Amino acid sequence: MKKRTIIALIVAIVLIFTGTVLLILGLSFADDGTRESLLVAQEITLTETFDSILIDTDVCDVVFVPFNGTADPHVIIREHENTSHSVQVEDGTLKIRRIDNRTWQDFIGINWERMDITVYLPQKQYESVRVTTDTGDIKIPEAVSSEEILLHSNTGGIFCDALAGNLLSCMTDTGDIHVSGCAPVMLNLESDTGDMKLRNTESTEIHLKNDTGETELENVICKLLTCESNTGDVFLEWVTAEEYLQVFTDTGDVEIQESDAGTVNIETDTGDVEGHFLTSKWFQAHSNTGNVRVPNTREGGECRVESDTGDIHFE
């Protein structure tokens, strides 16, 4: 193929791409000034009692607002005109589900306004709270209390301060997870690339799984703590696992400060491990090519630390 022909093809492709972008932007801003009006708000008053909550949405943020008093619970939904949600109470469960009436033209353009669902509910003990969203954030304050809380968002963040009795489970793909002030029997947090922050929490079992995001724990008490990460770092401060602490990483570093556990097991591939325990430990530390420096004690709980190329330093 001649050089001129190649250049002409490249120019044509660039022009087609540029024209497509300009067309999309033109369609988007052609109705500039009316975009905000397309966000419609509706308020639904709930007259039936419910003990469980089930929310299944797409791009909406979900926010819980507890209140004291005799007012009826209600839901306020701000959404685009061609997207709607059904709100009803069935068999003691408040169910909010997305109904998508959009056509392909509605997906063209840029929507700056974020849609959201705000649930105003009485302060009481609920049996179950389940929320699923795709790109929306989920926010539950500390005044919300439920035996079971299950939260899932793909790219949205999860911010939970609620009191969970038996189970609190938070799962995201790229969104961050922030949990504080919870006291469930079982706590499960899982993310792919999002960061995890767990603070001021007391639980029986805590299981954390992350891929590339960072994992931070501060002021946490439990009996069993397992933490698994790939390339993300793990940082523990003022964490007490009364029976067992286990941390696995690939390339992520592990730092443990002012923390303690009955038995400790830490394994990394290339990640460094360092820190300080509040009580004496019987260290069994080994690294193939990394530097190892740990206290030479033979008392206290067993602390097994292994790494391939990472350094191991404990004071």
Question: Where are the predicted features?
Answer:
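Acidic (Asp/Glu) and glycine-rich low-complexity loops/linkers
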Residues: 2-57, 61-133, 137-153, 159-172, ...
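Extended ligand-binding clefts on enzyme/binding-domain cores
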Residues: 231, 251
